[in-house]
UniProtKB/Swiss-Prot annotation:
<feature type="domain" description="PLD phosphodiesterase 1">
    <location>
        <begin position="229"/>
        <end position="256"/>
    </location>
</feature>
<dbReference type="InterPro" id="IPR030840">
    <property type="entry name" value="CL_synthase_A"/>
</dbReference>
<keyword id="KW-0812">Transmembrane</keyword>
<feature type="domain" description="PLD phosphodiesterase 2">
    <location>
        <begin position="403"/>
        <end position="430"/>
    </location>
</feature>
<feature type="active site">
    <location>
        <position position="415"/>
    </location>
</feature>
<dbReference type="Pfam" id="PF13091">
    <property type="entry name" value="PLDc_2"/>
</dbReference>
<feature type="transmembrane region" description="Helical">
    <location>
        <begin position="49"/>
        <end position="69"/>
    </location>
</feature>
<keyword id="KW-0677">Repeat</keyword>
<feature type="transmembrane region" description="Helical">
    <location>
        <begin position="20"/>
        <end position="40"/>
    </location>
</feature>
<feature type="active site">
    <location>
        <position position="234"/>
    </location>
</feature>
<keyword id="KW-1003">Cell membrane</keyword>
<dbReference type="InterPro" id="IPR022924">
    <property type="entry name" value="Cardiolipin_synthase"/>
</dbReference>
<keyword id="KW-0997">Cell inner membrane</keyword>
<feature type="active site">
    <location>
        <position position="410"/>
    </location>
</feature>
<feature type="active site">
    <location>
        <position position="236"/>
    </location>
</feature>
<keyword id="KW-0808">Transferase</keyword>
<feature type="active site">
    <location>
        <position position="241"/>
    </location>
</feature>
Length: 490
């Protein structure tokens, strides 16, 4: 009987072993298929080699991370963009678009535009003249301007942020939107589902019950898209009545007002935009809204434009683009510099193209400056940024660390007439994984304001010198290099 019991158990053990073997073979096959996919789709040779090798030899460890981090294009968004563009074209057919054409033609005559011709082809948006722009330094000025515009809204409010918090600032925004919705204003509120993961459901429900159309931007539509949590909508946009728009680095939370240690005071920059280019901000928002809801917000053009003003171009970028628009944007701005290029970013994890552009600018005799934080909000990213900063110093770039608090602004200044403000960081995440938006302005007056702002920031910063580079301990350098290994997904 004992032998009979053993005989009964033996097939069961063999069956379990067979299933385990089939599972391992299946994972190995999936790893091989994913490796082929990586070779065909990953945009950089280094990334393709790294993913393909690990997927072939360690599929049990790397298959799931590849589904999350490895895919560099948000394919489902591409089709949503096409459909949104078709519907926007129909909606815009009855509007008078002649000012767009007239301003685009006028823009080509501006001298500062000549060095940035590639931007138009990269972004699908025209370069438009006769815009009014205003620099908004730090949170108090930025939110005061945004809240004032929202309070005066008559028709439509578009709101988009990466992070929204249910704190004093978030509740103030909530109350303003509820008041405008109660007065018949259409309000559309888009937030990133991952960036705002801590936002309580009650915050969203109160707005919805008050008539605000509020949705989270998520990649969860479709089987494979559920794994694409690495793609985030990092844009910060507010548009009121199609007349004025706001873009920059601020999210909605009291830390952006400098009220949350240990990173306080918080250093950030926004800008206000009025004129034809606001329509491009509406288009960017509409594409994102269509992905989240399969519907479009109203498109509004003001009855007339100013007869003079600044040249502006909205540069919206993301993983749905055919090329790395954000990386190319920075390369184009750096290459356009003849006298100087000053860049400020909370993170400095550049790709090879941007590093090469910085080196070439130094060799051309351009004053190349980089302003980064002296305090980390993400230690791994900070370590990787520090290593790249050391390499930049070796190439002749002047690197400064902002001392008073955390520096979060994303600003580029080129020569005496060109500046850009927006949401894009100087890192791989913004280059290839995030949806970002920058506004390029060609105007000597605005560039002068940006220059004065950055000069004040440099005055409160310490330059990172070659002596500092030599004083970094070997253990610290090892940590920096380990951080750089994972920089493609930071």
């Amino acid at each position: 009987m004992a032998a009979t019991g053993v005989d009964k158990d033996r097939p069961r053990a063999m069956t379990s072993t067979t299933y385990l073997g089939l599972l391992l073979v299946g994972i190995q096959v999936l790893g091989f298929v994913a490796a082929i996919h990586a070779v065909l789709t990953v945009r950089t040779a280094q990334g393709a080699i790294a993913w393909a090798t690990s997927l072939v030899f360690m599929p049990y460890l790397t298959l799931l991370p590849y589904l999350v981090f490895g895919r560099s294009r948000f394919d489902a968004y591409i089709e949503a963009r096409r459909q949104a563009n078709r519907e926007m074209h129909l909606a815009a057919a009855e509007l008078d678009w002649r000012p767009w054409v007239e301003e685009a033609l006028a823009a080509r005559q501006v001298s500062g535009y000549k060095g940035l011709k590639a931007l138009v082809r990269m972004t699908r948006t025209p370069t438009l003249a006769n815009n009014r722009v205003r620099l908004l330094v730090n949170g108090e000025a930025s939110f005061e301007a945004m809240f004032k515009a929202i309070s005066a809204a008559r028709q439509v409010i578009l709101v988009q942020f990466f992070i929204v918090r249910d704190d004093a600032l978030g509740q103030r925004l909530q109350q303003l939107l509820l008041e405008r919705a109660a007065n018949g204003v259409e309000v559309f509120f888009l937030y990133d589902a991952i960036g705002s993961h801590a936002l309580p459901h009650r915050y969203v429900e109160r707005l919805r019950q008050g008539g605000v159309q509020m949705h989270g931007f998520s990649t969860g539509s479709g089987m494979l898209n559920r794994f694409q949590v690495n793609f985030r909508n990092h844009r910060k946009v507010v548009v009121v009545d199609g007349e004025c728009g706001f873009v920059g680095g601020h999210n909605v939370g009291v830390e952006y007002l400098g009220e949350k240690p240990p990173l306080a005071p918080w250093r950030d920059t926004h800008m206000e935009l009025r004129g034809p280019a606001v329509a491009c901000l509406q288009e960017s928002f509409a594409e994102d809204w269509y992905w989240a809801t399969h519907s479009l917000p109203p498109l509004i053009l003001p009855p007339q434009y100013d007869s003079e003003g600044a040249l502006c171009q909205v540069v919206a970028s993301g993983p749905a683009d055919a090329q790395e628009t954000c990386s190319l944007f920075f390369v184009e701005m750096i290459n356009a510099a003849h006298e100087r290029v000053w860049i400020t970013s909370p993170y400095f994890v550049p790709d090879e193209a941007v590093m090469a552009a910085l080196r070439l600018a130094v060799l051309r005799g351009v004053d190349v400056r980089l302003l980064i934080p002296s305090r980390p909000d993400h230690r791994t990213v900070y370590a990787a940024s520090s290593l790249y900063a050391l390499e930049a110093i070796r190439a002749g770039v002047k690197v400064f660390r902002y001392q008073p608090g955390f520096l979060h602004q994303k600003v580029v200044l080129v020569d005496r007439d060109t500046a850009a403000v927006g949401s894009a960081n100087l890192d791989n995440r913004s280059f290839r994984l995030n949806f970002e938006v920058m506004v390029v302005t060609v105007d000597e007056g605005f560039a002068g304001e940006v220059e004065a702002m950055l000069e004040a920031d440099f005055a409160e910063s310490l330059e990172f010198t070659p002596e500092d580079r030599r004083s970094v301990r070997r253990l610290q350098q090892l940590g920096m290099r380990v951080a750089r290994l994972v920089s493609p997904i930071l």
